[in-house]
């Protein structure tokens, strides 16, 4: 099944969707990606980092702002694919869903991210250093 998150104002000209596609206005990424097999998105930092944290392979379009950099990082790390001039194809989607190396690399990055200290832990260290003149 496919969940298609698309704002109402972006639906002009949208064709009838197959029965296995559920159209939603908005859904929290953490909930959406829990149990997902793949994620296709524009490459914004929120989507990219949430997918990396969740261990989900990605197809990242990466057009505009920081999105191209995010897409390149995901692809270089082996966690995703940047579409070429042909755009999104069935071959690309099949690779996203069935390429074990994409899943393996995505799982590795998720494990690395999980090992990082939490923001609260970092804040505690910084506060201690401030109180002790940087020591």
Features from the language model and the residues they span:
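Short, structured coil segments at secondary-structure junctions
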Residues: 17-19, 54, 77-78
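Class I S-adenosyl-L-methionine
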Residues: 15, 72-76, 107
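Structured helix-beta-strand junction loops
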Residues: 35-36, 77, 116
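A donor-sugar binding/catalytic signature common to diverse glycosyltransferases
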Residues: 24-73
């Amino acid at each position: 099944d496919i969940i298609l998150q698309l704002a109402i104002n972006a639906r002009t000209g949208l064709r009838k969707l197959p029965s296995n596609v559920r159209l939603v206005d908005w859904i929290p990424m953490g909930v959406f990606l829990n149990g997902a097999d793949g994620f296709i998105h524009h490459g914004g930092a929120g989507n990219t980092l949430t997918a990396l944290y969740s261990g989900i392979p990605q197809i990242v379009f990466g057009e505009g702002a920081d999105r191209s950099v995010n897409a390149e990082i995901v692809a270089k790390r082996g966690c995703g694919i940047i579409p070429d001039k042909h755009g999104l194809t069935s071959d690309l989607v099949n690779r996203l869903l069935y390429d074990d190396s994409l899943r393996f690399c995505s799982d590795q990055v998720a494990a690395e991210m999980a090992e990082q200290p939490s923001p609260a832990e970092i804040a505690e260290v910084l506060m201690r250093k401030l109180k002790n003149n940087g020591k």
